[in-house]
Structure formats: C-alpha cells, structure tokens
Amino acid sequence: MSFESNEYFDGNVKSIAFQSATLPGTLGVMDIGEYTFDTNAYEFMTVVNGALTVKLPGATDWKTFNAGETFEVEANVSFDVKVKVQTAYLCLYK
C-alpha cells in the first residue's frame, strides 16, 4: 500500500491521503495564511495541533477551532480558513 501526497496553495497546505478503519481521510499541515477550500465529499475536520479560524458556508461569523476540536462541512461547497500558526489537521470524508 502506498500513500498519496497532495500539495495546495503553492505548497502552503500539504496532506497525505490514507484509508482509516472506517472512512478515507487525509492528515495534513497548513502554513500561516488564508485559504478557500472546495469540498467534494462531506468532511469531518479535526484540528490536531494549532488552530483554524473558519467561515462555513452560509455563516456570517468566523469561528476558531483549537486542537482536539472538530467541525463539519457539507459536500460540494466552499469554506474559508484563516491560519495564524502552523496547524496540523485530520480530515475524514463521508
């Protein structure tokens, strides 16, 4: 078995895809910056270390998620992320 590596936003976001016991996922890191992500599947995003400030689709306010916290994003939408410190995350896809 091999792992697929992904790189986005000029190398500022990197991830490694894997198959968990229940769902496909990625484990990744984000550098300081602001990003807009598009989803293809329903996502469960957990901050492993650091923090992500997120504006979910339809929301008017930004919300910060710290290490150990999870947010969910519907499939086929875009969401915005602000990263103030290098952050590690786990994303599972449903």
Swiss-Prot record:
One Pfam family named in its UniProt record: Ppnp
Iron-sulfur is among the record's keywords: no
Function noted in UniProt: Catalyzes the phosphorolysis of diverse nucleosides, yielding D-ribose 1-phosphate and the respective free bases. Can use uridine, adenosine, guanosine, cytidine, thymidine, inosine and xanthosine as substrates. Also catalyzes the reverse reactions.
Gene name, Swiss-Prot/TrEMBL: ppnP
Keyword check for Glycosyltransferase: yes
Domain of life: Bacteria
UniProt record similarity statement: Belongs to the nucleoside phosphorylase PpnP family.
Cellular component, GO annotation: cytosol
Lineage of source species: Bacteria, Pseudomonadati, Pseudomonadota, Gammaproteobacteria, Alteromonadales
Reaction(s) catalysed (UniProt annotation): a purine D-ribonucleoside + phosphate = a purine nucleobase + alpha-D-ribose 1-phosphate; adenosine + phosphate = alpha-D-ribose 1-phosphate + adenine; cytidine + phosphate = cytosine + alpha-D-ribose 1-phosphate; guanosine + phosphate = alpha-D-ribose 1-phosphate + guanine
Name used for this protein in its record: Pyrimidine/purine nucleoside phosphorylase
InterPro entries named among the record's database cross-references: Ppnp, RmlC-like_jellyroll, RmlC_Cupin_sf
Species of origin: Psychromonas ingrahamii (strain DSM 17664 / CCUG 51855 / 37)
Keywords, comma-separated and alphabetical: Glycosyltransferase, Transferase
